[in-house]
Amino acid sequence: MSEQQIDLQHQANVIRKLTLEEIGKLGVGHVGGSLSICEVLAALYFRLMKIDPHNPGWPERDRLVLSKGHGGPALYAALALKGYFPIELLDTLNRPGTMLPSHCDMRRTVGIDMTTGSLGQGFSAAVGMALAVQMDHLPNTIYTIIGDGESDEGQIWEAAMFAGGRRLDHLIAFTDYNKMQIDGYTQEINPLEPLEDKWRAFGWHVQSIDGHNTDEIVSAVEQAKRAQGKPSMILLNTIKGKGASFSEGKLASHNMKLTEEMWKAAVAELEKEGA
């Protein structure tokens, strides 16, 4: 089956199912912020990114920096589904000796382009990669996903100012805008609005879309690639914990315990939908 024939929403649901299984078998993890990014991961890995799972170090590949590194379980699910490593390894999430720590580590996991978890730093690394692409006239596109809670970090805005000033148009960023963070609602903790205007003021091309609609994600990236002379920010309006009744839209889903009954029921629901 060609990449154009792959049902991206189906792939997103499979990623969501695998994510629930790996966190569920461990018993605890970052459920909310992993389940909210399954659609963008499906679009990137199964349609948009120029990558080769059989040659993960390919110099001309596109890169993804998951700056909100606590979403690692979803990224691992996408990588396994794409063929970077066996799906069975997902059962080792965050266990002794694993190659799949709770937060992304480029030295331990094949397919991970940057170690992340200290909020704000991954985004800065992605900006640095995009600068290298520009300076060396390379064909790579650099993608990065940041969190809305992560957007409280001053380092995000320092990097945003630099990227806009340097006109890094090989950089496409996404914000997982689920309106929740570990301490509460983003609007109550540190209001981000007007978020679109903020990014435009820093010299970015900005779009705001449904982050759970794979067609909109693909279209937004295609439009971003046509925006010459500007880095692009795509605000993904998402729901934290999407796809499981015990986590969807719930603040407690940021990092939560899962019983076997909980995660198996959620997986069964996804399987009914064809995952």
Curated annotation (Swiss-Prot):
Keyword Transferase attributed: yes
Pfam families reported for this sequence: Transketolase_N
CDD domains: TPP_TK (cd02012)
Keywords of this entry: Carbohydrate metabolism, Thiamine pyrophosphate, Transferase
One example GO MF annotation: transferase activity
Function: Part of the sulfo-TK pathway, a D-sulfoquinovose degradation pathway that produces 2-hydroxyethane-1-sulfonate (isethionate). Catalyzes two steps of the pathway: the formation of 4-deoxy-4-sulfoerythrose (SE) and xylulose 5-phosphate from 6-deoxy-6-sulfo-D-fructose (SF) and glyceraldehyde 3-phosphate, and the formation of sulfoacetaldehyde (SA) and xylulose 5-phosphate from 4-deoxy-4-sulfo-D-erythrulose (SEu) and glyceraldehyde 3-phosphate.
Organism: Clostridium sp. (strain MSTE9)
Cofactor: thiamine diphosphate
Gene3D superfamilies to which the protein is assigned, alphabetical: 3.40.50.970
Record's catalysed reaction(s): 6-deoxy-6-sulfo-D-fructose + D-glyceraldehyde 3-phosphate = 4-deoxy-4-sulfo-D-erythrose + D-xylulose 5-phosphate; 4-deoxy-4-sulfo-D-erythrulose + D-glyceraldehyde 3-phosphate = sulfoacetaldehyde + D-xylulose 5-phosphate
Ranges in coiled-coil conformation: none
Subunit structure: Forms a complex with SqwH.
InterPro entries: THDP-binding, Transketolase_N
Keyword Nucleus: no
Gene symbol of the encoding locus: sqwG
Family: Belongs to the transketolase family.
EC number, UniProt record: 2.2.1.15
Name listed for the protein in its UniProt record: 6-deoxy-6-sulfo-D-fructose transketolase subunit SqwG
